[in-house]
Amino acid sequence: QMSFFDHVTVVHGVGVGGGSLVYACTHPTPKDDFFEAASWKHLANWKSELEPHYQTATRMLGAEPNPCDEIGDQIVREIAADLGRADHYEKTRVAIYFGEKGKEGKEVPDPYFDGKGPSRVGCIQCGACMTGCRVGAKNTLDLNYLYLAEGLGCVIRPETEVTAVREREGGGYVVETKCSTADRDHVNFTADNVVFAGGVLGTIPLLLAMKADPLGLPRLSDRLGDFVRTNSESIIGVCAEDDAVDYAKGIAISSIVHTDDHSHFEIVRYGKGSNFFQPYFLPHAPGKSLAGRVAETVRILRRHGGRYRAMKRAKDMASQSTIMLYMRTLEGSLKLR
């Protein structure tokens, strides 16, 4: 699902497994400056508080260094050397089951939880991690946390949206839900405690609505939605002149270069045929209105049309292009209202 705001476009997962269904599998551990950010360092020693949980998540999600080396990784290594940052190039740590070399695509019994988890299939490097792993190599939550929880008796209700959470007289809460795919009867639940874990765009809008509702959760903080952080992504597409090289082979994000203490860029790919994001290769055209941005796009295309010729001719953008994903950890935030 994509949500569009004035300053950012957000891609997020909706389904059993949430964002794990569409994320790029990477599991970096933040650097010290993240834990020492001025906005929250006074609240706790976050590094020591969170370290055990990073370790648990790494184990549960089977995160390991990417063992593959494809053309995109070689290009990133060359860029790192050109920038004088060769020592700051590394393979990503990813939640993917690779299996034994030579047995890619082969199904094996659960390799993670002493046989209590589902069988898995070794990664075939098809590049389709973010559009839904076709083989069962990506360690999405439905293959670990949720799978094991169901085995212990937890009931997972798919196609269900929480519409309200209200305090219950005498203590606890009432959770109101509706089916998200059919006009069925609404179902209410009661609980002593409620954990909100719907991601930013599944949680904050619901809480804002409940704060505004006198019968909801009106005592929530007035600062709700004030400090929403992003990873400050910039997406840069590069298209080859021909289809001599298959840039789609590999995993979604396979290697990374730390350009300085606060920023890095990664090589990103989609699987063959995943061309929905082809418009991202159009020129960046800022403006105060949609009409102004469209006009600026047309102007740039007229002036520099040759640069975009390869994009127009590409039979399959996913296999004929690669994406450079730039991020930074410096503090920056949005307000959601």
Descriptions of predicted regions:
Residues P30-K31, Y97-G99, A164-R166, G202-I204, ...:
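Flexible loop/turn segments at secondary-structure boundaries
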Residues C25-T26, F34-F35, K101-G102, P205-M210:
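Short, solvent-exposed loop/turn and secondary-structure capping segments
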Residues Q1-C68:
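Redox-cofactor-proximal catalytic regions of oxidoreductases
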Residues M2-V8, G13, A63-P67, R85-Y97, ...:
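A short alpha-helix-loop-beta-strand transition element characteristic
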Residues Q1, Y97-G122, P283-Y308:
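Charged, glycine/proline-rich intrinsically disordered loops and linkers
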Residues Q1, V135-K138, L143, G151, ...:
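Glycine-rich loop(s) and the adjacent beta-strand/alpha-helix scaffold that form part
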Residues F4-V10, G19, Y23, L43, ...:
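FAD cofactor-binding and catalytic pocket of flavoenzymes
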Residues N45-L152, R157-E159:
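Conserved redox-cofactor binding core of oxidoreductases
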